[in-house]
């Protein structure tokens, strides 16, 4: 029965996480799938892990020893991610020497080895724990043979982690840190940054190619010292969790252009097809770097909520917005969903928005964009007109109309501050 079930799962190309769950239920023990770099792809806690050996597993690499307490794993609650995944969180890409009572089999076929399946201590199974694990590995190997792109495991691991992080599916920060580290994103002693990356303009080819190039370029820009976990959101924007060693120059915010953006631009220049339209850009949004899990979560959430903002820097095909250099914009985008802020923005901009909604003579429909350009350069109207792509005379006429509609003086500092906040809260791009 077990053989039939697991074979059917493989032939049906059942989702990897579902296969792991069924294996865990069958063995009544935690089961972990790792890739060839020893990063956790998927895991399941099992309905009740049996207390097993109390020895420690030691993994040695170039004189360094990683100690894994199997007692901690054995006595953990069945959904204790921190205890179950701790061995993988401490590996740093090294192989794990299995403690007594653990079973591991390779996921491989036709000379390709994609990773390993590990079962933690549990009760004996009539068919044999190792036999069940081997059948599960066979089912996973069948699925990998059918995965021509070879990205399924990476996508699954990334999506799982973002679901955990953004959905609050963890009990405390150390549990989340363990899950991230086990999946290849080291946390302890690292500088952590949340970011988003999206293509702007016509790419000239299929969306899947654009996404693949953006993801590959960002991974290369972060490597080799940095680590990244990436996944697309519902709109296609690439969400990123980045981890760098302390002092890494790529996250230095002191210069006019973030070094990470320059590195990304270089990688894109090596990957983009010659047919890519000249106006296409990759827009990178960088959150505030931090050293704690809570800071990483805040960093990612703020760049997600902020959406697109005008670039503070550009290099090659890359434009950049930075939370550290645009704190007001990020703050107001974060508060824009609150009723009080929405009401403030609507009241402050109502005549202008109403004017833009109506067509006909005298209604250009671009007053919001004109105001955005002016507020970005309030002391240089010539530059603001250039940014708005209008002649100076037409631009000045639009400003006069805005002052008339809103009953304000656009040269007044308080007015500039009020309208800047209102536009940001309303979702404008100023």
Question: Which residues does each predicted region cover?
Answer:
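Alpha-helical/coil-rich non-catalytic "connector" segments in signaling and regulatory proteins
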Residues: 1-163, 188, 225-226, 267-270, ...
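Cytosolic nucleotide-utilizing catalytic cores of signal-transduction proteins
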Residues: 152-430
């Amino acid at each position: 029965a077990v053989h039939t079930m697991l074979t059917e799962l493989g032939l049906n190309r059942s989702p990897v996480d579902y296969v792991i769950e069924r294996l865990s239920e069958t063995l009544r023990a935690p089961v972990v799938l790792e890739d060839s770099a020893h990063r956790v792809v998927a895991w399941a806690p099992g309905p009740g892990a049996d207390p097993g050996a109390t020895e420690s597993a030691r993994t040695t690499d170039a004189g360094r020893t990683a100690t894994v307490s199997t007692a901690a794993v054995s006595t953990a609650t069945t959904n204790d991610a921190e205890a179950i995944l701790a061995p993988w969180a401490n590996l740093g890409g090294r192989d794990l020497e299995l403690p007594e009572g653990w079973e591991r089999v390779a996921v491989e076929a036709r000379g390709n080895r994609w990773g390993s399946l590990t079962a933690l201590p549990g009760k004996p199974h009539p068919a044999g724990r190792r036999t069940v694990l081997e059948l599960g590995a066979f089912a996973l190997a069948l699925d990998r043979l059918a995965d021509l792109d070879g990205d399924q495991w990476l996508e699954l691991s990334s999506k799982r982690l973002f679901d955990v992080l953004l959905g609050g599916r963890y009990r405390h920060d150390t549990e989340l840190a363990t899950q991230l580290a086990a999946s290849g994103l080291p946390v302890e002693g690292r500088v952590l940054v949340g970011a988003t990356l999206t293509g702007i303009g016509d790419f000239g080819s299929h969306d899947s190619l654009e996404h693949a190039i953006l993801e590959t370029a960002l991974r290369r820009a972060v490597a080799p010292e940095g680590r990244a976990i990436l996944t697309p959101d519902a709109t296609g924007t690439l969400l990123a969790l980045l981890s760098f060693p302390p002092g890494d120059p790529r996250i230095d915010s002191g210069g006019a252009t973030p070094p990470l953006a320059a590195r990304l631009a270089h990688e894109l220049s090596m990957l983009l097809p010659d047919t890519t339209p000249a106006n296409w850009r990759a827009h990178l949004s960088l959150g505030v770097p931090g050293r704690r899990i809570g800071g990483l979560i805040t960093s990612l959430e703020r760049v997600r909520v902020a959406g697109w903002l005008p670039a503070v820097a550009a290099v090659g095909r890359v434009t950049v917005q930075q939370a550290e250099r645009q704190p007001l914009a990020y703050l107001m985008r974060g508060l824009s969903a609150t009723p009080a802020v929405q009401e403030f923005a609507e009241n402050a901009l109502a005549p202008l928005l109403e004017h833009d909604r109506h067509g006909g003579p005298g209604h250009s429909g671009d007053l919001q964009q004109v105001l955005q350009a002016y507020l970005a350069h309030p002391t240089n109207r010539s530059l603001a007109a250039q940014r708005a792509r209008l002649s100076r005379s037409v631009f000045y006429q639009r400003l006069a109309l805005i002052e008339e509609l809103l009953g304000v003086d656009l040269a007044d500092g308080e007015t500039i501050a009020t309208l800047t906040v209102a536009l940001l809260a309303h979702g404008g791009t100023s």
